[in-house]
């Protein structure tokens, strides 16, 4: 399995289009622009579509996204060999741990404790080779 198969993870509020936090391995500006466009499209269509698992595929990478109530969207970019089951397991774990609720009231973004908890979880799943 490729090192660091999870390339990018974004948590955002799809009702406002605000990014709450992100986790990223090396991502170039072109890929980051692509991710932001995908998130913007998700925000336009996410209303009322809760807990629907979605996938966008390409030759080498896949995007997975899902929105939970009230309007927290997770967008994950992984290499195309990374198991879909593990992507949604990671998202469920982040959601269960209530990481999106760890908000800094001034910035309206996830606080440092939440960012560290997210980083720790992603690193576990980076190395997870369970099939």
Language model feature labels by segment:
Residues 2-6, 15-131:
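Acidic, low-complexity cytosolic segments
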């Amino acid at each position: 399995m490729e090192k660091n198969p999870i390339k990018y993870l974004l948590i955002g509020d799809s009702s406002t289009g605000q990014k709450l936090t992100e986790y990223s391995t090396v991502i170039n500006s072109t890929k980051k622009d692509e991710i932001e466009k995908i998130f913007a499209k998700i925000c336009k269509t996410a209303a009322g579509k809760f807990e629907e698992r979605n996938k966008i595929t390409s030759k080498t990478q896949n995007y997975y996204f899902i929105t939970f109530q009230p309007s927290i969207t997770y967008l994950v970019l992984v290499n195309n060999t990374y198991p879909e089951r593990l992507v949604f397991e990671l998202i469920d774990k982040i959601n269960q741990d209530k990481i999106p609720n760890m908000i800094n009231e001034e910035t309206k973004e996830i606080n440092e404790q939440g960012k560290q908890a997210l980083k720790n979880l992603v690193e576990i799943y980076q190395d997870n080779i369970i099939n």
